[in-house]
Amino acid sequence: MHDIASMIMTGAAKTNFSYTVRTLKTINQAVDDMTTSLKDVGFGILGTLDFKEILQKKGLDFKDEYRLLEVCNPGAAKQVLESNPEVGLLLPCTIAIYQKNNENFISLAKPTSLLANIHDYTLEKFGKEIEQKLVQATEKAK
C-alpha cells in the first residue's frame, strides 16, 4: 500500500477512489480557478457546500476550510442516465477543496472507482473519459 502522505508531498496522490493534488492557492482562489478550468472541459458547478460553515452552524467545532463542489457535464449526465438510470445515484461528480495541517488540497472522486461495481464496459470506458477531463481541470487549477 502506498503512503498517501508521501504521495501528496510529491504533488499528487492517486488512491482507488480519489485523485488529490496540493495547491499553494487560497481555498477561495482554488475554487475560482477550479470553476474556470472545469468550464474549459465542459463542466459546470451545480452547487457548493461549505462544510466549515455548515458544521459551525450546527454547533460543531470545525476550523479547517472544506468546500465540496458538485460538478456536472450535462451531455455526459444525459448519456449515463439514459444508459442506466441507477447510475444517477453516483451523480453529480464531486471535487473537494480543503485545508489540512495548514496546507490546501484539491481532490476529486474518481468516476472509474465509482463505476467499477456497475460491471458495464461502456460505462467504465465513459468513466475513464470523464475522469481524464476532471484530472486535466484539477491539474490546471492547482
Task: Locate the predicted segments by residue.
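Terminal, regulation- and interaction-focused segments at domain boundaries
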Residues: 2-42
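Short glycine-/small-residue-rich flexible loop motifs, especially phosphate/cofactor-binding loops
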Residues: 35, 52, 135
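Compact, glycine-rich, soluble single-domain proteins
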Residues: 44-97
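Short secondary-structure transition/capping segments
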Residues: 89-102, 138-142
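Beta-strand/loop substructures that line and gate deep hydrophobic ligand-binding cavities in soluble
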Residues: 94-120
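Well-ordered alpha/beta subsegment
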Residues: 117-142
